[in-house]
Amino acid sequence: MGRAPCCEKVGIKKGRWTAEEDRTLSDYIQSNGEGSWRSLPKNAGLKRCGKSCRLRWINYLRSDIKRGNITPEEEDVIVKLHSTLGTRWSTIASNLPGRTDNEIKNYWNSHLSRKLHGYFRKPTVANTVENAPPPPKRRPGRTSRSAMKPKFILNPKNHKTPNSFKANKSDIVLPTTTIENGEGDKEDALMVLSSSSLSGAEEPGLGPCGYGDDGDCNPSINGDDGALCLNDDIFDSCFLLDDSHAVHVSSCESNNVKNSEPYGGMSVGHKNIETMADDFVDWDFVWREGQTLWDEKEDLDSVLSRLLDGEEMESEIRQRDSNDFGEPLDIDEENKMAAWLLS
């Protein structure tokens, strides 16, 4: 709904008040009083709005208005009342005789609010800024990129290298047999497990990457020349064994004696094969497969006869080819043939 307008706003004069209008308004109020501000302009013969007449009288034409600047005592009163009443300017003005609410409001917005901003600054902040130590002097020169990068300090892992893995340095060699007539070895060994892979604490057992106690894996597996190299560092970082996983293999040698049997026996000790060896190598299966392959090999005479038969067949094929193409040409005939072809 709202309040009804004070006038029709038709034919109303706007802008600055003239001295004649000020005298007319003052004479009418002094003789008739303020009365109703809605009907006052019409009764006084002013072409002004009732609101404009009221503000002109209260703020400028009253006889009890105090002129001049606001004193420091009045400033203190305004500050105290503003802290309790807020922006209720008319109530503040009632405690300051001769001052209008509009004047107090303008003075607060233009002067006092700016002064109070400096008054209420925390002294601790000002003292901290004033008493701050000077910044340290920088050494001349450019800052390196490494110094500008953020540094992340990581707690190094306790990388323990057990020295308890001790195995006998030995080779497991499948036996080589000798023929009684001394014709030489029948065949090389099928498998040799070098002692370098089971050397001891310096060369721990093999295992898949990440199977170690700490799960670390050596990221670099290349040697100095860029080739793949299985050195001690890779073994140390890939898999480490302790005493509980140590593999002890006893050496085995075949008895190569002239008067011994053609197929000498062999013995592999399984004294201390622990759980780790059983997971990766089934020694019984290796032994059985090797013995089976050994029994299936033919003797030396059959091998030699097969080789001789192959050579005879090749000679027959070459002779047959020469018969099909005729006798080979001598050098003179070949030269003549080449000259005829090039002519």
Curated annotation (Swiss-Prot):
Residues 37-61, 89-112 bind DNA. Disruption phenotype: Accelerated germination, faster hypocotyl and primary root elongation, more lateral and adventitious roots formation, faster development of the inflorescence, and more lateral inflorescences initiation and fruits. The double mutant myb11 myb111 and triple mutant myb11 myb12 myb111 accumulate less flavonols in roots, leaves, stems, inflorescence, and siliques. The double mutant myb11 myb12 is specifically altered in flavonols content of siliques. The triple mutant myb11 myb12 myb111 is impaired in flavonols biosynthesis and exhibits a reduced UV-B tolerance. Expressed in seedlings, roots, cotyledons, leaves and apical meristems. GO terms for molecular function: DNA binding; DNA-binding transcription factor activity; promoter-specific chromatin binding. Residues 9-61, 62-116 form the HTH myb-type domain. This is Transcription factor MYB11. GO terms for cellular component: nucleus. Residues 126-146 are annotated as: Disordered. It comes from Arabidopsis thaliana. It is found in: Nucleus. Modulates overall growth by reducing the proliferation activity of meristematic cells and delaying development. Flavonol-specific transcription activator involved in the regulation of several genes of flavonoid biosynthesis. Activates the expression of CHS, CHI, F3H and FLS1. Confers tolerance to UV-B. InterPro entries: Homeodomain-like_sf, Myb_dom, Myb_TF_plants, SANT/Myb. It comes from the Eukaryota.
